[in-house]
Amino acid sequence: MINDIKQLHKRYRLLVHLSNNHVYAQIIDDLNNRTVLSVSTLTPQVKSKLSITCNKKAAELVGEYVAQQALNFGIRNVVFDRGRKLYHGKVEVLANSARSFGLKF
């Protein structure tokens, strides 16, 4: 069991946060305690494509963009961290979108 946990810490973590107005996704390197990249509905490339920033379409676009950016950084495998949110609705849409664009978790 301990070895499994250590293996997970060698991978990057995709953290998802939802507020009332925006969708956020970060890829975090826990070994070095730093955020590698961050994408949200406030990111200009994402915001320009949306009229509403807190729906499933916004979550899908954030998932797509975070996956593309991660692949540009050479990150393919991540651990999905949804916090206390249920794997439902916007969280599920973001995860499926990131998977469809090449992230593995």
Swiss-Prot record:
Family (UniProt): Belongs to the universal ribosomal protein uL18 family.
GO molecular function terms listed in the Swiss-Prot or TrEMBL record: 5S rRNA binding; structural constituent of ribosome
Source taxon at top rank: Eukaryota
SUPFAM superfamilies named among the record's database cross-references: Translational machinery components (SSF53137)
A GO biological-process term: translation
Gene3D superfamilies in the record: 3.30.420.100
Keywords: Chloroplast, Plastid, Ribonucleoprotein, Ribosomal protein, RNA-binding, rRNA-binding
Record function comment: Binds 5S rRNA, forms part of the central protuberance of the 50S subunit.
NCBIfam families (alphabetical): L18_bact (TIGR00060)
Subcellular location field: Plastid, Chloroplast
HAMAP family, A to Z: Ribosomal_uL18_B
TM segment ranges: none
Pfam families: Ribosomal_L18p
Assembly and oligomerization: Part of the 50S ribosomal subunit; contacts the 5S rRNA.
GO cellular component, one term: cytosolic large ribosomal subunit
Protein name (Swiss-Prot/TrEMBL): Large ribosomal subunit protein uL18c
Biological source species: Cyanidium caldarium
Species classification: Eukaryota, Rhodophyta, Bangiophyceae, Cyanidiales, Cyanidiaceae
